Amino acid sequence: MIQSRRINVIVVISVLLSLIVSIFLIVMGNIQKEDKDTRTEPLYATKLFGTDIISVEIIADEVEWQKMLENAMNEEFIMADVIVNGTKFEKVGIRPKGNSSLSQVAQSDSQRYSFRLQFDKYVKGQTCFGLTSFVVNNMLGDNTYMKEYISYDLMKEIGVDAPYFGFSNISVNGKEWGLYLAVELYNDSYEQRVFGDASGMLYNVKSMDMGGNNADGNAGRMPDAVPDGAFPAAPDGGGSGNFTPDMEKNIKGEFSVEGIRFEGRQPGGMGGGRGSNGGSLEYTDDNVSNYSAIFNNVVGKGTEADYKRVIEALKALNEGRDLEKYFDVDQILRYLAAHTIVVNLDSYSSSMAQNYYIYEKDGQLTVLPWDYNLSWGGFQSGDASDVINFPIDTPVSGVEMSSRPLIERLFENEEYLNSYHEYLQELVDKYFADGRFESKINKISALIDEYVKNDATAFCTYEQYKTAVSSFNLLGRLRGESVQGQLDGAIASTASGQKENHGTLISAGDLKLSDLGSMMGGRGQRSSEGSEAQDTFADGINDVQAGRGPGRQQSQDINSGFIQNRQQTGNYKYLILAGALMGVLITSILLAAKLKRNY
C-alpha cells in the first residue's frame, strides 16, 4: 500500500510529467513549423528572384556557342560558366528551348532563342541558390514585354501558387544579348517550397504532339504554339471573335501541318472531341492511353497507380460528385478568376485544351498556370472588343461549356460560382480600379524601358514597344471595366447574353490587338536587318511584387499568395496538438485524483 504521505509526491510527479510531455510536443511543433517556413522561402527566392532585374552573364566557348545556335533544333546542351546576380557558377548546362517558337526562330535570321539553364547537368548536386534549373524566355509574340508578366502577377495577387518569375538581362561573352523572362520550373524545388515536400505528381498538359529532342519544364515534347501559318493571327476587324461556335467546325480524322500532328481538329484548334486525349479533363474510360495529353508529359517518372488516381478524379469531376475530395476547389476558382480576366485562349478555355499543369497528391488535383505569352487576346481572338468583353460566366471559346467540365461543374454549384465572382471582384478592386492597372504598367515600363531600348536582339522596335505599352494600358483598363460591368449585371456575363445585348458591350474604339504583338504579328527585328520572325515563346512565367514596383524586394512577401492557405492547414495541426495536450493534462489529473481517493 502506498503511504498517504507519498500521495502528494505522486500527484506532483504526474503533473510534472504531463507538463514535460506538453513542452516537448510544443517544441517539436515549433521546430516543424520553422522547417516548413524554411521550405517555403528558399534562398533562390531572394538571391535569384529578389531583384528588379536578374543579371545572367553566360560565358561559353565561342565555337561551341555558335555551333549550338546553328543546330538549335537539336536542343543539345553545351557547358558554360554562368554569373547570376554576381555569383559565378561553373560548368552549367545550357541549351535552346521551345517548341514552335524554337523552329520559328531557327527559320528566321535571328538567334534569339529561349534557353534552359541546368546547373547540375555537369556538376552533380550543383544548384543556383537551391534551384537546379530555370529557363529564360525570349519575348516572342509580345511587343509589350509584359503580357505574361502581368498575367502571372494577377495569379499571385489572388493567391494562386504560381512559380517565381522576373525580368532577366542576358549577356553572352561580354556582349549584351537581350531582355528575357527568367522562370522557375515546376519541379521538386517548386513542390518543396509550396507544398512542403516533393511527394506529389506534376503533369504538363499539352494537347498537340510535335517533333523535337527535349522537353521543356521536364515534360513531354509539346508545342507552346504552332508554326507560322498553322493558325490565324488575331484580326483587328469586326466580327464576333471567340463567341460564335458555328465559326469553328470540327474536322474528324488526322492530318499534319509542318510536322504537327492534329487529332480530330482543324488548324486553329476547332476540335477537341469528347475526351480525345485528356486535355479537356473529360472522362473517357479507365484506359491510361486515352489521356496522353496528361500522362505523356509527367514531370519525372509516373506509375500506373499515379495515373489511375488522376483518372479516378476526372471520373468524379464528370459525374459532378465529391468535388472537394478530388479537387482543391478554392485554389482552382482563384486560378479561373485570374485566367478569365487575361483571356488566354491557347489554354484549357479553348479547343486547344492545354498549357496548364496538374498537381496531384493523395488523389486530390489542382491546376497550376503556365504559358501566358499569348494572353490578352494574342491567340484566336476576334477584335479588341471580344477580348475586353470576354464573358466571365461562359469563359470558353470554340467549345461548349459541357466539354470543359472543370469550369462547367464548378460553375453549376452556386456557392462555388459566388466564390469565383468574389475573386473576380477582388482582382478588379486591387488591380484595376482607380487607375491601378495603368499605374502598374507604367512602373514596369519605367523599370524595363532602357533595357528594351538597348535590346540588341529584340523582335520589335523600341517605337513598337512604346505603342504596345500604350495599347496595353488601354486594353487592361477597359477589360477591368467590362468585368466590373458583368459582375454588376450591366453587361451580360455569358456569350449568348452578349449576343442578344450587343449594345451594352464596352467599345474598343481604335484599339488594335496587333499593336500588342501576336503569334503571327511579325514586327521585324533590330538585329536581323528587318527580318520578321514573330511567334510565341514557351513556358514563360515571371514574378512581380504585387502592389509595388516590379521585382523590388520580392523576398518579403513573394509567397503571400499561397502562404495563407498553407498556414490554415498548419493551424488545424496546432488545434489537434492543443487537443492532445489537453488530453494528457486531464489524464494526469484524473490519475492523481484516483490515487488520492484510493490511498
Task: Please provide the spans of the model-predicted regions.
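Phosphate/dinucleotide-binding and metal-coordinating scaffold of catalytic cores
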Residues: 1-599
